[in-house]
Amino acid sequence: TLINVLTGTTKTCALIGNPTEHSLSPTIHNSISFMTQNDMAYTTFCVEKDDLGDAVKGAYALGIQGMNVTVPHKENVMEHLVEIDPIAEAVGAVNTLIRVDGGFKGANTDLLGFARSLKEAGFDVKGKPACILGAGGVARAICFALVEAGIESIYILNRTKEKSLSIRNALNSYYGYKKVECHVFDYDYAEKLNIEDFLLVQTTNVGMYPHNADCILAADSSL
């Protein structure tokens, strides 16, 4: 295993979420730190929802240099930050906490990561529709990234419409009502959608550890 020898000067970064034991982030970051001779260690903390505020304050008090945030805390963690990047504020979710004076600043790199993935795959979304499954923090970021990339329309499918409507309102508030068409449906409406040549993005926690074999779409789904 490629990992630094920890000393009294080693800087610590971490991932917070629930669950976190399946994450590959420690392996990735610790290996990079070793190869670049960066005196940094990366670990994970499984944090319950009710303990989130205490966890953020405690991490700052303990000198944690920065943290990544995963489900289910990407939205709720925002109320415990001293500063938030403007685009992350508009998205309504953060996945990165940067140590600043007095606390942590929130940012969202999901937008950049998703946009880069589309570019590397050679997929041009301009003028096309997209169907988003789920309406959590990742879905919010992806919707903003799609608008930035020139998507024509977005269809958000979620179990309940409340979070989907929140995303639509956030998009309209930031970009204006004429920038993109955003439609909101529950999963029961999926088979009634009449769209072709669209981008499908699965953002729910279905298929995550420990239920890796689960799939949100049935094998014979018409979607």
Predicted regions, residues:
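Phosphate/diphosphate ligand-binding glycine-rich loop within oxidoreductases
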Residues: 6-121
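Residues at the starts of beta-strands that form the adenosine-phosphate
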Residues: 12, 41, 129, 152-154
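Glycine-rich adenosine-cofactor-binding loop
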Residues: 17, 108, 126-151, 158-159
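Conserved acidic residues
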Residues: 65, 152, 198-199
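Glycine-rich helix-loop-beta junction characteristic of Rossmann-like nucleotide cofactor-binding loops
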Residues: 120-124, 221-223
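NAD(P)-binding Rossmann-fold cofactor-contacting core
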Residues: 151-175
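Rossmann-like adenosine-cofactor binding region
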Residues: 180-223
